[in-house]
Amino acid sequence: YQRDDLNGFTLGSDPQRHVGAKSGMSAELAYLDSEYPSVFVTHVYKNNYLPFGNTLWRFNGDYFSDYGGDYGVNQCGWGWGAKFFDVNNSGVLSLYVANGFIAGDPQKSYWYKLAVLSSAPQGIVSSPKYWPNMKGQDVSGHEQDCLFINEGNNRFYDYSNDADLQIDQDRLLGRGVAVLDYLNNGSQALTVSNQLGRAYLYKITHLNTNNWIGFKLIGTKSNRDAVGVKMEITLQNKKMIRELYPLNGYSSQSDSRLHFGLGNADRIEKINIYWPSGKKQELQSDIKLNMYHTIKEEL
C-alpha cells in the first residue's frame, strides 16, 4: 500500500508481480545500504514441506524484489518476531529471529501428516474435524532462534549455533523480540519472549571502542512520541538512516530512542531530522558522541 495524501492509502503493488501467498508472521523495517527502506517478513520454513521461508523486500525506486535467499536470511524455521539491531556499534545492522510453534515428541513430526492432508479434497482440508490428532505431535518445536550477523555487503550468517553466544539453548517457543539499551551505554540488548517459558535477555558482554550516538525525540506539531520520524546522519564516507517504529514486530515494543553505531568515526558531518509533520530540522554536527540526546521538534 502506498501513501496517498488525498485518500489515505492505495494499493500500490502490481497484482502481476505477486509471488503467491505465504504465512506472514511479523514485519520489520530497516535501511540497509539504500535510500529506501527494506522490509523483512518472517514466514514458516520447513525443509521438504515449505521451502521458501522469510522474505527481505528491497525497493529499487519502481518495485520491491525479494532478496531473502541472496542475503542468507530466508531459513529460520517457524518464524515469529524479528528485529534489526547493531550488535557492535559498527553501523551495520544484524538481525535476530525468534521461532518455534508446538513442541511435542521430536520423533513424532506432524508435518508428514499435514502433507498427506494437503492432498485431500478441499472440503476435508478446510475442516479441522478431519485433521489427524495432534496430541503429542511436534510441529516445528525445539527449533533454535536465528542470530543473523551482517558481515558486510549485506551478507548475513547465522551464528546461533556458536556455543560461546548461548543463543536459545533451551530451544523454547520464541515469539516476540524487542531491542533496548537498558544500561544506557550504547550497547543494544535483546529481549525475547517465549510461549510457555521464561523470557531471554541477551546483552553484549565484551564492549569494543566503536563510537555511537542516540536520540530521544519529542514531537510538538508531530505526535509527542515522534513515531514515524526519520533521521539521517552523514559521516565522512557513509550515510545512515533510521526511522522510529518501536511497535514493529510480533507482540513486542522496543526502545523508543533512535540509535546509531558510528564505528571508528569520531565526528558527524551532518544530522537531519524529518518529522512526521513534514518539518525538516538540522542539528549541529559538532554534537557530543557516546551519549543520548533529547531533541524537541522546532515550532
What residues fall within each predicted segment?
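Surface-exposed loop/turn motifs at beta-strand-loop junctions within extracellular Ig-like
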Residues: 43, 99, 274-277
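Short glycine/acidic-enriched loop and turn motifs that connect beta-strands
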Residues: 45-48, 102-104, 197-198
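Gly/Ser/Thr/Pro-enriched helix-cap/hinge segments flanking short amphipathic alpha-helices
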Residues: 137-146, 150-299
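Acidic/hydrophobic-patterned starts of short beta strands in beta-sheet-rich repeat architectures
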Residues: 34-42, 89-98, 184-193
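Beta-propeller blade termini
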Residues: 15-16, 23-35, 80-89, 174-183
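Generic beta-strand/beta-sheet core signal
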Residues: 3, 30, 42, 57-59, ...
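Blade-edge motifs of beta-propeller repeat domains
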Residues: 1-22, 47, 53-77, 113-172, ...
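Short, solvent-exposed beta-strand-terminating loops
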Residues: 98-116
